[in-house]
Amino acid sequence: MLMIRDFSNRFQQISGMPINSKGGKDMLKRAGIDTNSKQYQAVMKSMSAACSGVGYTNVQAIKNRMSRYDKDVDYISPVTGLAGLVVTEKNRAEKNRIIDIPESSRDEMFELAKKEFLQENGVGNGDTTRRSDVYLNLYQKMDKNDRLAAGNTLRQYERAYTQAFVDAVKAIDPKWEPGKPIPSGALDGITRESIDNLLVQSGGSLVKKTSSGSTLDIQV
């Protein structure tokens, strides 16, 4: 049974009262917790699912957990402060959808991907990349219900930009491999628009059109 413990002296004096009793609910109400709210119900459900039966908690812990849900009971990421980024049964289909995203986000990704490609000689370095900042900036521009799809769309552009850089370097040096020096000026003629114009949607992906009009999957 979920119990209340150590919330102010009053709660300490009557520690152990069942949270689902009338007295327990009255105490929660006096502490500013609406036990009829969707956030409260979501917290109780998640806490019950996390253990066999229900464990122990205190009022402040419940308040903290409730603050992690918005009015629609969508989880708010403590990292980004945004909702709509956790895959659930409700939004699962969104994570593989392609949608229109701001041109500014595509510009930001192109410029950063190019800079890091040159700095790391084409090696993807998860320790130093700042691309997560580009995604966060995008999510902040999007409606909550479009954030998963926007992230998927930006990933497709990110892959396309990186592949275009690889192709450009290999056009100059066919034996080039990631980690080897990149020939000076190898990426000078590449623009974001030139890459974007070659991409078409195929299901939940963006693929490159060939000269014949067919599509070519991008592999990076």
Locate the predicted segments by residue.
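Type III/flagellar secretion export determinants
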Residues: M1-V220
